[in-house]
Curated annotation (Swiss-Prot):
Subunit structure: Monomer.
HAMAP family: Glu_tRNA_synth_type1
Motif segment ('KMSKS' region): 238-242
Protein name: Glutamate--tRNA ligase
Organism (species): Proteus mirabilis (strain HI4320)
Any GO BP annotation: glutamyl-tRNA aminoacylation
TM ranges: none
Annotated residues for binding of Zn(2+): C99, C101, C126, H128
Family according to the record: Belongs to the class-I aminoacyl-tRNA synthetase family. Glutamate--tRNA ligase type 1 subfamily.
Organism phylogeny: Bacteria, Pseudomonadati, Pseudomonadota, Gammaproteobacteria, Enterobacterales
Primary localization: cytoplasm
Length: 472
């Protein structure tokens, strides 16, 4: 058996969205599972809509997801000479022909067909001769599609699919301006690049019989095809570049880990028993095209969030820290005076479902705050909190070995000494050192903030209570 070779071939007319990312992932996994090769190809024949920022966004998305490619990126715009060479060979061989029909004639033909309730299609007017035209007159080149029989291909996901050749008109393969068309470029690329399996969205099913006929006319091998069903949004509507689809890099910006998004995307249409959590190695080991569902998959943001929380807490903290660092920089936080990012992940991992949330909620570990959160201060920084704060401050000041255990002991001893519940000490202390009413466990929080900073903040809270008393 020849080496398996797949490709991901996005059009750079927008960012890489989740549908494209899932297609790329499936193609990548299939090649890796079979120890084959994965090709990245940029289908930029739409010269008006293809942009360099979109190409950059695709590359950024692929790199962030760690979907590495073995060949490419290839650009179709750099291969126009090759496409035109093949078209000229087809003209000479009689498998393509020049069409001189005017735009007006084709529009009238379309209107007449639609008025009769017929499917609009080219009527083959120029199929059997040039009708006294010369090659230097404006024309397109059409593929001479077979008029009898049918095209049958065995879709690796959907099973046998058949199209009658009578339903397929003669496809334009070169425009009037001399540029080759998308459907033709794809065929030549897959042939030249020796692609064995084409894995793509179900919106390409209708292109497949036309592409197979061109390959057969060229005497080229026909690859296997697998058409993946669409993804529906949380609202049940189709995700597309132009509607409701979120860029892969937006998920990065929103604080998701690539491991979480990959795990989510692989399960969005593919399954292996009832397993939900997959490492990359497990995906590669277990992935098959036959296990992909024919049905549309519904995107569920809550499930992605659950997976992200899982990976924040189960991946090595050092690995998560690499991604968290980007979000910390977005918040302009200097982490040199506070816990390391690895420590921060261990502190906040259980509480935070995204890295963005973690970066936004960690400021008090590194930066002194100007004011207390109003509701928390009103409830917990009252005159009754003065004594617990003063006693716990003095006990914290006396600690020579600054550990979370000794911090906990100081809080506990304060409660016992004053004969009050832990909450009567803990909540005022929490608001004093963090500025708010919520944080990880108080002993590890105070320990991470540091001795000098914690004591200074307790003193600030005591001043706040004094000011409050004076204003009463």
């Amino acid at each position: 058996m020849s080496k398996i070779k797949t490709r991901f071939a996005p059009s750079p007319t927008g960012y890489l969205h989740v549908g494209g990312a899932r297609t790329a992932l499936y193609s990548w996994l299939f090649s890796r599972h079979n120890k084959g090769e994965f090709v990245l190809r940029i289908e930029d024949t739409d010269l008006e809509r293809s942009t360099q920022p979109a190409i950059d966004a695709i590359m950024d998305g692929m790199n962030w997801l760690n979907l590495n490619w073995d060949e490419g990126p290839y650009y179709q715009t750099k291969r126009f000479d090759r496409y035109n060479q093949v078209i000229d060979q087809m003209l000479a061989a009689g498998t393509a022909y020049r069409c001189y029909c005017s735009k007006e004639r084709l529009e009238k033909l379309r209107e007449d067909q639609m008025a009769k309730g017929e499917k609009p299609r080219y009527d083959g007017c120029c199929r059997h001769g040039d009708h006294n035209h010369t090659p230097d007159e404006p024309h397109v080149v059409r593929f001479l599609n077979p008029q009898e029989g049918s095209v049958i291909f065995n879709d690796k996901i959907r099973g046998p699919i058949e199209f009658s050749n009578q339903e397929l008109d003669d496809l334009i393969i070169r425009r009037t301006d001399g540029s080759p068309t998308y459907n033709f470029c794809v065929v030549i690329d897959d042939w030249d690049m020796e692609i064995t399996h084409v894995i793509r969205g179900e919106d390409h099913i209708n292109n497949t019989p036309r592409q197979i006929n061109i390959l057969k006319a060229l005497g080229a091998p026909v690859p296997e095809y697998a058409h993946v069903s669409m993804i529906l949004g949380d609202d049940g509507k189709k995700l597309s570049k132009r509607y409701n689809a979120v860029s892969v890099m937006q998920y990065r910006d929103d604080g998701y880990l690539p491991e979480a998004l990959l795990n989510y995307l692989v399960r969005l249409g593919w399954s292996h028993g009832d397993q939900e959590i997959f490492s990359i190695d497990e995906m590669i080991k277990d992935f098959t095209l036959e296990a992909i569902s024919k049905s549309a998959s519904a995107f569920n943001t809550d499930k992605l969030l659950w997976l992200n929380h899982h990976y924040i807490n189960t991946l090595p903290a050092e690995q998560v820290a690499v991604h968290l660092d980007w979000h910390i920089k977005q918040q302009n936080i200097d982490t040199s005076n506070g816990p390391s990012l690895v420590e921060l992940i261990k502190l906040l991992g259980e509480r935070c479902k995204t890295l963005k949330e973690m970066a936004e909620s960690c400021h008090y570990f590194y930066v002194d705050f100007d004011s207390f959160e109003e509701t928390a201060a009103k409830k917990h920084l009252r005159p009754v909190a003065r004594q617990p704060l003063e006693v716990v401050r003095d006990k914290l000041s006396a600690i020579t070995d600054w550990t979370a255990e000794n911090v906990h002991k100081a809080i506990q001893e304060t409660a016992e000494e004053l004969e009050v519940g832990m909450g009567k000490v803990g909540m005022p202390l929490r608001v004093a050192v963090t500025g708010a009413g919520q944080s990880p466990a108080l002993d590890v929080t105070v320990h991470a903030i540091g001795k000098a900073r914690s004591i200074a903040r307790i003193n600030k809270a005591l001043d706040f209570i004094t000011d409050r008393e004076n204003q009463a």
